[in-house]
Regions:
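Juxtamembrane/transmembrane-helix boundary motifs at the membrane-water interface
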Residues: 33-51, 296-305
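A juxtamembrane structural motif centered on a specific transmembrane helix
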Residues: 1-10, 14, 376-464
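Long extracytoplasmic/lumenal interhelical loops at the membrane interface
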Residues: 259-319
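Hydrophobic, Leu/Ile/Phe/Ala-enriched alpha-helical segments that form helix-helix packing faces
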Residues: 34, 277-281, 377
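Membrane-interface helix termini and inter-helical loops of multi-pass transporters
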Residues: 37-45, 141-151, 261
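Hydrophobic transmembrane helix bundles of membrane-integrated enzymes that assemble
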Residues: 7-33, 51-69, 74-254, 304-386
């Protein structure tokens, strides 16, 4: 009885912990989405006040999560070390991004990926819808920008920048594809294709359009059965290639090289800026704030010190050697773990996509966009990757083939129930038993048979 009570208490605590985590993610996404719009206030609160309120609510949810999340002492110490490291990197770099990402990973035990995707889908879809409606209604300003290489103005459609519209639309579509993962058909690709058209022709945001095209293609391909076998290996190979290429171009970019120059132009000077900040400032262990770097005027007239739009280069120069090393190791280890467990679900597919997109954006370290980073929590707490997407596990179980079986006589059952018991007694396997112990009058004089799994046999045999 006590074990049953403990089991119920543990399950209830896990569900309560999941609920407060999802609530924290909702407030975090809501704040990020609102900050990308052109709204001056939300429910009477100015944007800085609204941001502070959301941050406090997220922290409060994490404080509650501590009460429900169970782990061993050693795992707790490791989690505490990661949080402390993120705080040190924040103080050194002046960027809180690393703290939020680490907190969501550390408190991500027992969390599932599809509820996170559902929250992201609702938040970003509604944000796009309301911002566009308010823009055409004149409630918010339609800010226009000029791209140096293009003719005409770029509309922001109620956002603070055209690229912000593209990012919100991208994240809404990626969340939708994550929810549909395993069942994505051609009809499901209509909305992503329409979104790509809106990104290109309405706001001229090419990076988000290309990212959504890549994400939709990979999600559609990697949802099929072969992905369970090949997905982890393919993802591991691509991840290593992307990380190595990022650091190679950061260190060895040469504008005189035709390949380098062409790729740099296609990526809007991303290779140049990564190399510029890598060679211009020394690498640090915990990060650097680049306060002494010259201000760069971006397209939206915002002046910033650091312009590096590659996840791995950005992590290295902004948050230091240790954080960059841990990020790369975690990416490799999680796909090795997936290969070992024979698991490839929506969380791992999304993480693989974000690793690829990290070559040209810093989205891969922003948890509001890359909530697939919650997969790293399985490394921290040694939990199976399959629990990130239980619905996929149940679906695979329903589709699993019947395991062939063989039968042998069980003398102990014969001695117990006598020769009057009927035909076969099946223990295990996928078939239902035709009788139960103690029934009489079926095939009198025949020995009961017990079914045992034997994967070496391709047919079913019966001994009576």
């Amino acid at each position: 009885m006590s074990s049953l009570v403990d089991s119920v208490a543990e399950t209830t605590g896990m569900r309560a912990g999941q609920a407060v985590y999802y609530l924290a993610f909702f407030f975090f996404c809501l704040n990020e989405a609102v900050c990308r719009t052109a709204f001056d206030n939300v429910l009477g609160l100015d944007i800085p006040t609204f941001t502070s309120l959301c941050n406090y609510l997220v922290i409060a949810c994490f404080a509650l999560k501590i009460l429900f999340q169970r782990s061993t002492f050693s795992r707790g110490i490791l989690a505490l070390f990661l949080v402390a490291l993120s705080v040190v990197c924040w103080r050194a770099s002046g960027n809180t991004l690393v703290v939020w990402t680490v907190l969501f990973i550390v408190f991500g035990k027992d969390v599932e990926i599809r509820p996170l995707a559902a929250i992201a889908f609702v938040v970003y879809s509604l944000t796009v819808f309301l911002a566009v409606i308010c823009c055409f209604s004149g409630i918010v300003e339609d800010i226009t920008y000029l791209r140096g290489s293009s003719v005409g103005a770029r509309s922001s459609l109620g956002f603070n920048h055209p690229n912000s519209f593209g990012k919100c639309l991208l994240e809404a579509n990626l969340a939708y594809l994550t929810l549909r993962f395993g069942k994505i058909n051609m009809y499901d690709l209509i909305v992503p294709l329409l979104s790509i058209g809106a990104m290109i022709f309405l706001v001229d945001t090419r990076t988000s359009a290309f990212a959504l095209l890549v994400a939709a293609f990979l999600m559609f391909i990697l949802q099929h059965s072969f992905a369970k076998r090949m997905g982890p290996s393919i993802s591991l190979g691509i991840s290593v290639a992307i990380i190595v290429a990022s650091y190679y171009f950061m260190a060895a970019y040469n504008p005189g090289n035709t390949l380098h120059a062409t790729l740099n132009e296609a990526l809007s000077n991303r290779l140049y800026y990564a190399n510029y900040f890598f060679t211009g400032w020394p690498l640090t262990l915990f990060g650097y704030d680049f306060a002494d770097a010259p201000l760069h005027l971006r397209e939206n007239q915002a002046a910033i010190h650091l312009i590096v739009d590659n996840t791995y280069s950005f992590t290295l120069v902004q948050f230091g050697l240790l954080t960059a090393f841990l990020l790369c190791v975690a990416v490799v280890l999680v796909f090795l773990k997936a290969k070992k467990e024979g698991c490839f679900n929506a969380a791992l597919c999304g993480l693989a996509i974000m690793v690829v997109l990290g070559f040209s954006e810093t989205w891969s370290v922003r948890f509001d966009a890359n909530y697939f980073l919650v997969a790293f929590s399985t490394l921290l707490y040694s939990t199976p990757l399959s629990q990130l997407d239980p619905s996929a596990t149940r679906s695979n179980a329903n589709l699993s083939p019947i395991i062939p079986t063989t039968q042998v006589r069980d003398e102990s059952l014969f001695n117990r129930f006598g020769p009057s018991y009927g035909k076969e007694i099946r223990l295990g396997g996928a078939w239902k038993p035709r009788g139960q112990f103690g029934l009489r009058g079926i095939g009198a004089g025949r020995l009961p048979a017990v079914q045992h799994r034997d994967v070496s046999l391709g047919t079913k045999s019966f001994r009576r």
